[in-house]
Amino acid sequence: MDYDSVGVSLQDQDFFNAKLAAKMPWLGGQAGAVDVGGDYLVSGCDGIGTKIKLYLENKDVKGVSIKNLGQDLVAMVFNDIVCFGATPLFMNDYLAVPSIDDEYLELIDGINDALKELEGKPPLISGETAIHPDIETFDIAGFGVGACPKANYIDGKNIKEGDVILGLRSSGFHSNGYTLIRKVWLEKEALRSKDRDEIIKRLLTPSRIYVNTILAVLRKYAPSINGICHITGGGRENLNRLMGENLNLRP
């Protein structure tokens, strides 16, 4: 089973992204950067996809919380931004809901709690809540901004042959691939077994936020780090895009 079999075409997405790049000259990698004098402002926008649907289908499982989706959103936004060496400054959110429910306040609490754990404690400064009665489920997206001195900006252009690739252990699936994950797991007998709730809780584990770890590493080893990649949608292909056409990965 692959993405195509569940209605997600990565090839179509790549073609569409190429067309977008022609219309957005600042588009670059997992976030975009703007020169503001001595610094770069780095911005990113993301969502948490169909992990929301998995939550809604299993919200009654003990230990499952909508607050965790708030951490997922912060992770998706700022894990991208920190790849450029940027320290988080602030975040906005967009929440679309079928109707008003106090449950969504817990979702915002999850965002705020996650932001408080980041270096610099960036605030959630504003947002938009749209009531769309015709939609079946809620959706949320986040927009974040960070900053870094030009001298510390990392864009992968200095990656060269012989560089070593180091990986950080993830917390699980982050917030990507859940359309495929749901299809695979829901067809497995395991989700109808006594272990079902534990599997659901693991699938809904909030995404690890790597910001503080990456910034600490950069303070100590910045001159030796030529590129950073957030492995989410697309997996290892993200590394290939970062390295460019003339370099390849080797075990």
Regions found by a protein language model. Give the residues of each.
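Short amphipathic alpha-helical segments
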Residues: 56, 179, 240-241
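N-terminal glycine-rich phosphate/pyrophosphate-binding loops that anchor nucleotide-derived ligands
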Residues: 1-82, 117-127, 160, 165-167
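Alpha-helix C-terminal capping segments
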Residues: 79-87, 242-243
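Glycine-rich anion-binding loops of enzyme active sites
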Residues: 35, 48, 60, 73, ...
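Short, compositionally biased
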Residues: 178-189
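Alpha-helical elements of the RecA-like P-loop NTPase motor core of helicases
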Residues: 14, 179, 237
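Glycine-/charge-enriched secondary-structure boundary and capping motifs
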Residues: 1-7, 62, 95, 102-121, ...
